[in-house]
Amino acid sequence: MRLMGLDVGSRTVGVAVSDPLGWTAQGLEIIRINEDKEQFGIARLKELVKQYEVTAFVLGLPKNMNNSIGPRAEKSQAYGELLKTTFGLPVDFIDERLTTVEASRMLIEEADASRKRQKQVIDKLAAQMILQNYLDAKGPLTKQ
């Protein structure tokens, strides 16, 4: 039983997956998308869902600082609906405010990553943080 965490942007989707017990999240990759052309990376997600035997999705919900839902959060919700329709799997959302900012800070301070390197990994790290925050809040997937 694994969860897939997604950080959905307008040009990329960061992807992370949990371990089978739901303790930790690992960043997998970044999928290029194009919202304007309605290219959402579903073919690649299908491969990953099958490969990792994913049972549910967790998407970051980028709320505004005043807790309201803005255009970017609405796009994330629409992406979640697309996933439900396509995969027939549950989709949950978690507040992701400042996740990308925190991921960037980590890359600079802890990994001393260049701006170019940050762009290559930041969405994957943000997806990992989104999923890890969700796992930490919900507890392990296999309760005894």
Curated annotation (Swiss-Prot):
InterPro entries to which the protein is assigned, alphabetical: RNaseH-like_sf (IPR012337), YqgF (IPR005227), YqgF/RNaseH-like_dom (IPR006641), YqgF/RNaseH-like_dom_sf (IPR037027)
EC main group: hydrolase
Localization: Cytoplasm
EC numbers on record: 3.1.-.-
GO biological process, one term: rRNA 5'-end processing
Keyword terms: Cytoplasm, Hydrolase, Nuclease, Ribosome biogenesis
Pfam families found in the cross-reference section: RuvX
Keyword Hydrolase: yes
Gene3D superfamilies according to UniProt: YqgF/RNase H-like domain (3.30.420.140)
Gene Ontology molecular function: any one: nuclease activity
One GO cellular component, as annotated: cytosol
Top-level taxon of the source organism: Bacteria
Main location: cytoplasm
Family: Belongs to the YqgF nuclease family.
HAMAP family: Nuclease_YqgF
Function: Could be a nuclease involved in processing of the 5'-end of pre-16S rRNA.
UniProt protein name: Putative pre-16S rRNA nuclease
Organism: Lacticaseibacillus paracasei (strain ATCC 334 / BCRC 17002 / CCUG 31169 / CIP 107868 / KCTC 3260 / NRRL B-441)
Lineage: Bacteria, Bacillati, Bacillota, Bacilli, Lactobacillales
